[in-house]
C-alpha cells in the first residue's frame, strides 16, 4: 500500500479546508493510500514534521497557503530520498497554485494528486535553511505577508495584504543588498 503524509494548516484561507477535509481524505483513501495526517500548530511545524516523517512515505501532500507550501518544501529538502509532493491550495490568494493551473476547488486538486502526472519544478534556497518554489522576495513590502494577521486574511482575503502594505508606506527605507552566485557578487 502506498503511504501518504498529509499536512494541512487549518487556519489558512478562511479555514476553508474544514468543510472539505473528509472528502479530501476519502479521495486519498479510495486511491489506495495509507494516510498519516498532521494538523499544523505553529510556524515551521510543517517543515519539522515533513523532515521527520517524509522519509517514510511515497507522497507528501500539503494544504494551506504559500507559507505552508514553502515550509513543506523546506522539510522535504532535508531528506535524502525525496517523496513526491502534492499541493491542495487553501490560502488567501493561492498565487503559486494559479500559476501552475492547480484547481482552486480542493477536491479537484486532490484528484489531480491521485490521477495526475508528476513533473519536476525548481527550488531555491534562502538564508541557508528555507527553500521556495515560487517567490523569494526582499526589500519594500516583503514584511507585509508576515505582518498580516491570519484573522485579517480570513476576513478580508487578498485585501488584507493591501491594507497592511498601506500601513508600511511611512516606514520605507533603503536596504543593503548582497547577492552571491557562481563566484560572482553583486552588492549595493
Regions found by a protein language model. Give the residues of each.
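Short amphipathic alpha-helical segments
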Residues: 18-20, 73-76, 98-100
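Short beta->alpha linker loops
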Residues: 41-44, 64-67, 91, 139
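ATP/NTP phosphate-donor binding region
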Residues: 1-63
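Short, glycine/acidic-enriched loop or turn micro-motifs at the edges of active sites
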Residues: 12, 69, 92
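Catalytic core of DAGKc-family lipid kinases
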Residues: 31, 78-188
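A residue-level signal for conserved active-site and pocket-lining positions in enzyme catalytic cores
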Residues: 9, 66, 144
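Short Gly/Thr/Asp-enriched flexible loops that form oxyanion-binding sites at enzyme active sites
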Residues: 68-80
Amino acid at each position: 500500500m502506498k503511504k501518504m503524509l498529509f499536512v494541512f494548516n487549518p487556519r489558512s484561507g478562511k479555514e476553508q479546508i474544514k468543510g472539505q477535509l473528509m472528502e479530501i481524505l476519502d479521495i486519498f483513501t479510495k486511491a489506495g493510500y495509507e494516510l498519516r495526517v498532521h494538523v499544523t500548530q505553529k510556524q515551521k511545524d510543517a517543515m519539522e514534521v515533513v523532515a521527520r516523517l517524509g522519509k517514510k512515505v511515497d507522497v507528501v501532500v500539503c494544504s494551506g497557503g504559500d507559507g505552508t507550501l514553502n515550509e513543506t518544501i523546506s522539510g522535504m529538502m532535508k531528506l535524502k530520498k525525496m517523496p513526491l509532493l502534492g499541493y491542495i491550495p487553501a490560502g488567501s490568494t493561492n498565487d503559486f497554485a494559479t500559476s501552475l493551473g492547480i484547481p482552486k476547488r480542493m477536491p479537484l486538486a486532490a484528484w489531480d494528486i491521485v490521477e495526475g502526472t508528476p513533473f519536476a519544478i525548481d527550488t531555491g534556497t534562502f538564508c541557508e535553511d528555507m527553500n521556495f518554489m515560487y517567490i523569494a522576495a526582499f526589500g519594500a513590502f516583503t514584511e507585509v505577508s508576515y505582518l498580516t494577521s491570519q484573522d485579517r486574511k480570513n476576513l478580508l482575503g487578498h485585501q488584507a495584504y493591501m491594507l497592511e502594505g498601506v500601513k508600511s508606506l511611512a516606514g520605507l527605507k533603503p536596504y543593503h543588498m548582497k547577492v552571491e552566485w557562481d563566484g560572482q557578487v553583486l552588492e549595493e
